[in-house]
């Protein structure tokens, strides 16, 4: 693999954003399906995150110190796979010939068949609740200082599960959870409920106990400041970055236009888009990696727990025995997960 850029300034991050847009267009047009415009709106956000803030060892996805990146807007998979190309874990050939093909690991919505994907997403409103679970595990079970970054779409902000997740994140003081909301104003059926009304989103986030940061989602300097502030693990609140963006940003024929959700650009149109975006690029980047942390804590310690005992022949309802055991094990807070 060629030597990647590792000391990435904002100018290079902006170039990376353009590359992610170009590759989102190329891959979806090649596949004949996909969501390029939804990917283009969030490209700058992800370019700055991956190149300057996400602490991740791409060669060791099982490193317990790695940050976690969850695409709650899983339909923006062209963007995620373009990121994987940019960090060198998949090739341009795989991106162009594998995306959305039968039998390929580059599925229409990301799944853990890829070692860098924690959870399968695509059902809107699912990714942030997943992120809360991962953040809980990091803070209370493993006690490892990773951050959980969740990319959300503005359409899914109408889902109740998003707000339930934020409520629980604030209750459990998950400062290690950062949601990035791509407010591009347009959903599958037209304008979203609140459009670009970031003040309404801000009031709702704060009402549920979160810290809101409102930015221009195409200003790489503003993005960089917001990510640095959110990722500092200061305070006790989850952070929600509310980024105003343009769907299809960078290509004038589709930018902020309705009826382009979930539609690949026709071949000739895609060529014009690539030209307007400055042509193909093949930047290779690597951002920060996690520092050497203490091994994560094993949540066992059963010797400290006095389990219920019953006399031979004593009749005990299974649900009561199960409940008694859970109550005893639960005396050690957040040390037990059961289904």
What is the predicted function of each stretch?
Residues 1-149, 199, 282-338:
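Thiamine diphosphate
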Residues 56-62, 66-68, 105-280:
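Glycine-rich ThDP/TPP pyrophosphate-binding loop and its adjacent helix/strand module
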